[in-house]
Amino acid sequence: MPRRNDIRKILVIGSGPIVIGQSAEFDYSGTQACKALKAEGYEVVLVNSNPATIMTDPELADRTYIEPLTVKYLDEILRIEAEMLAASGSNGKFAVLPTVGGQTALNLAVELADAGILDKYGVELIGAKLDAIKKAEDRLLFKDAMTRIGLDVPRSALVNNIRDGLEFATKIGFPVIIRPSFTLGGSGGGIGYNREELMEILARGLDLSPVHECLIEESVLGWKEYELEVMRDLADNVIIICSIENMDPMGVHTGDSITVAPAQTLTDREYQAMRDAALLVMREIGVETGGSNVQFAVNPQTGRMTVIEMNPRVSRSSALASKATGFPIAKIAAKLAVGYTLDEIPNDITRMTPACFEPTIDYVVTKIPKWQFEKFPGADENLGPQMKSVGEVMAIGRTFKESLMKALRSLETGKRVGAEVLEPRRLTQRLVTPQPERLNYVRFAFRQGLSVREVARMTSMDPWFLYQIKEITDTIAAIGDATFDNVSPEQLRKAKRMGISDERLAEVWGLTGNEGVAKVRELRQGHGIRPIYKLVDTCAAEFESATPYFYSSYEEEDEAPQTDKRKVIILGSGPNRIGQGIEFDYCCCHAAFALKEDGFEAIMVNCNPETVSTDYDTSDRLYFEPLTLEDVLAIYEHETANGADAGMIVQFGGQTPLNLALRLKQAGVKIIGTSPESIDLAEDRKSFGKLLEQLQIPQPQGATATSVEEALASAERIGYPVLVRPSYVLGGRAMVIAYDAAAVSHYMKEAVEYSQERPILIDHFLEDAVEVDVDALCDGTDVVIAGIMQHIEEAGIHSGDSSCVLPAVDLAPQVLDTIRDYTRKLALSLKVIGLVNLQFAIQRDKVYVIEVNPRASRTVPYVSKATGVPLAKIASRLMTGRKLSEFLPENIASGKDLGTGAHYYVKSPVFPWNKFPGVDTVLGPEMKSTGEVMGVADNFGEAFAKAQLSAGLILPSSGTVFFSVNDHDKAALVPLAKQYIDLGFQIVATEGTAKVLHKAGIQAESVYKVKEGRPNIVDLIKGQRIQLIINTPRGQDTFFDEQAIRRAAVLQRIPTITTIAAARAAAEGIAASQRKHITVNPLQLLHAGHAVK
């Protein structure tokens, strides 16, 4: 069937901010879909609230709306677009594609249909029909559908109250699994082992489910879990793209499981039965066009197979299957949605076979999740049906062993394999209960002499996987006995074929530091043991592959032919994590696009399956490899073996490539852009302090310390409060504001493991300062300031966790001039080539430099979207020797910033509190947000309100505000309270705060603090009497009392504001939303006339 010519315009719904359970994979799928639809000649309109995505780049759609993903805003966008279509005189149809934006887009599509909005504007849903979405997503309808086609499902009941849930659980017996309907990443789900746990989880699940219902399901804990990625077209052709096996058993969310493709432990007969079942599911649910994933559980004792669930959309597993096979699922799903059939679409990798050929792979792929519980003290680390990982890595090897070991070293835990802190007495508990360190305990169990059978019994992992892990452990032990001087080339080759790194071998032989690793490398290369590169080609080498997509292995035949083009290798940012997210991937992609346009061969190195950077057509050559010194050097040597000229970019991938920069340069790699020495100078406390003195630029008083005594003496000299942190970290990892000596000594005892032989930094903390972020471009001669962003939270809250606004709203002109002056001086003194990010604190109109990062920062995508100038593209061109005068001559001549026209752009962070209900929500110098959103309007208040709405904080337009502010903030309290009273709010306050308000003649109801008596403030929150909380904590004493308030607020989903500055911004936002109807503007219109390509 050819493409549908009756459709003229297609709205693609994005997935919004990055949250746990919905990550960068939807930027990758949305980008592919937009490109495919635009290439087919459709008018493409995109809506998404996340500025850090490639899909929101203005060139990917005809109109791009960065707006909140709510029914109200989509109604307005659909109205405008439907009117434009009607006015154009075209009789073409208007369609919405909701299957590439994750759960967010699907839920929105259902809401728009149910509210009659799609019918109102004559809009058709494509990619998935409404009844198919409902059948797959509604637990009861799905269960009935499976029963109708004769497939087994776990016994279950759909409940909408706790009594029915208890009744059913008692009937089928504990434990039971609780799964809320229409939620993402298993939000609100859990395992109830008894009545109390069931009641607690069910109450939370019913609250989080948009339709207030949960499925209570018979436990299949310990069963094996499989997924099939399936595609179907309108002619009923169905193909299986990939089978995926979870190494962890049922009971752990698939996003938190180690997964392997293709499935390793199925017999052919079992696989065929599962394949047949998946085809039946697709047809019964009615997914006519596009990709879905179907999840199965198999009882290892009896072989009973049950269907667990299906997603009628492109999912996290689709991204993995896509990268594992080279088959562009999202692109093909978009083409199927507009009427093509699989046999009409060519396979982009081979360019000889159609898409209806099922991919075949002759290698093994392993995905391992990345968790960051260290960011959330108090969070429950046990893994269950609710997803908790923040990112993932993928590795490809010729065997399972090789791909597992490569994936483990891609994780960048900062801890060496073999150096984990293990507690022998907790071995049994750690094997039985799934948690992030479980694999380390499995290896430890084998070192302690436990058998595969015993470990399989405790972990419910398939013995096949455990035998593989035991073989790796045994090989490492044997090679350790062989010593460095006596090891044979055969033993060494065997270890390398298993994926064991040089660093691990050095450790086994007791060779320390970088020199030890270099010795192993020399020995290995002396024996001629070097990696070769194999192709990912979708067809197990049966056809020629046209796209160079490689992975390393220690075999004989190399499939990566050398080229003699001028090339640039871009080091990616590895797994998504807090502090280093999709923003850095965005910069890497832009570098690849610009370099390709300029005639360079762009080579990408990364190991994250969720991102656009690892898409087969982003760069000219893609190496899916770990970002370690060994792996990166091997690629560089391979690419330059024939004498080809290759530069390497390290400033776009966040901290990961920067940590390798100096060692790469010492090994002879040509690093382009800002030199590793300059990067080091900016990070090194003493040298940087000297530079600031020479330039006469003030910074907060600071010192360094390597012991508790030194730290206490320094803090005393500088004066409390102090900011204590390790050197060389990203995302404010392990930072704290200390108000007294006890806090400093506690920190020093905790922090030493992060310092990597580098000292702890102690700074005077500037209280009540306004923080400012600056992004600038520099070519060594000229500097152009891209944006001066004013933070809405005060200094001391990590810049990644603070909302910020461009242009700055209330900084004095002379302060802005000082910031510009300091920025230019520092960029030129540090010899920056490319991007630089500076952070300033302004206290009583005096400007202090907090830090300078001569690299791309997480604000680059946001500033690029706000100014219409692709900063990362220009920066990568500067690195190849081009000059700013070619791109921004007017700004150089006038000295002006890039500017944002007549609009305000507010960036707000998004937090994962609902996944970690036990964690305190107060913000500080350590970053905790997982993603970001942007609000755009012609006034600050509306832009802030939009950003808050996109981040999931719905500011109330009326009701009661609870105030509890510390003594220091009481001066600002009265005018703030008046603002809220003028907006029509009532005020409730704690005793001290209420007294201040009464004195000023403001009416406020007084309420008990948590420890003072009942009914206290937490009772009011739980009784839904409070609509907004303004609670500014200070120091340790008040901290615990307020933790209870903030926790209760998270559970009741009441917006909580912890700084006076943000409370003022919220008041402006509420005023804007009370004032007028909503406005929406596409980026293309905002930047018409001044965008730079």
UniProtKB/Swiss-Prot annotation:
Write down how the cofactor binds this protein.
Binds 4 Mg(2+) or Mn(2+) ions per subunit.
Catalytic activity, as annotated = hydrogencarbonate + L-glutamine + 2 ATP + H2O = carbamoyl phosphate + L-glutamate + 2 ADP + phosphate + 2 H(+)
Region Carbamoyl phosphate synthetic domain, as annotated, extends over 561-952
Region of interest (Allosteric domain), ranges: 953-1093
Tell me the keywords, alphabetical order. Amino-acid biosynthesis, Arginine biosynthesis, ATP-binding, Ligase, Magnesium, Manganese, Metal-binding, Nucleotide-binding, Pyrimidine biosynthesis, Repeat
Annotated binding of Mn(2+) 4, by residue: 851, 853
Which residues are involved in binding Mn(2+) 2? Answer: 309, 311
Carboxyphosphate synthetic domain: where is this region?
Answer: 1-412
- Binding of Mg(2+) 4: at which residues? 851, 853
Question: Does the keyword RNA-binding belong to this entry?
Answer: no
Q: Which SUPFAM superfamilies match?
A: Carbamoyl phosphate synthetase, large subunit connection domain, Glutathione synthetase ATP-binding domain-like, Methylglyoxal synthase-like, PreATP-grasp domain
Positions contributing to Mn(2+) 3 binding = 839, 851
Per UniProt, Mg(2+) 3 binds at 839, 851
Pathway given in the UniProt record? Amino-acid biosynthesis; L-arginine biosynthesis; carbamoyl phosphate from bicarbonate: step 1/1; Pyrimidine metabolism; UMP biosynthesis via de novo pathway; (S)-dihydroorotate from bicarbonate: step 1/3
Q: Does the keyword Cell division apply?
A: no
Q: What is its EC number?
A: 6.3.4.16, 6.3.5.5
| Gene Ontology terms: cellular component | cytoplasm
Q: Which positions bind Mn(2+) 1? A: 295, 309
Q: What does this protein do?
A: Large subunit of the glutamine-dependent carbamoyl phosphate synthetase (CPSase). CPSase catalyzes the formation of carbamoyl phosphate from the ammonia moiety of glutamine, carbonate, and phosphate donated by ATP, constituting the first step of 2 biosynthetic pathways, one leading to arginine and/or urea and the other to pyrimidine nucleotides.
- Name of this protein: Carbamoyl phosphate synthase large chain
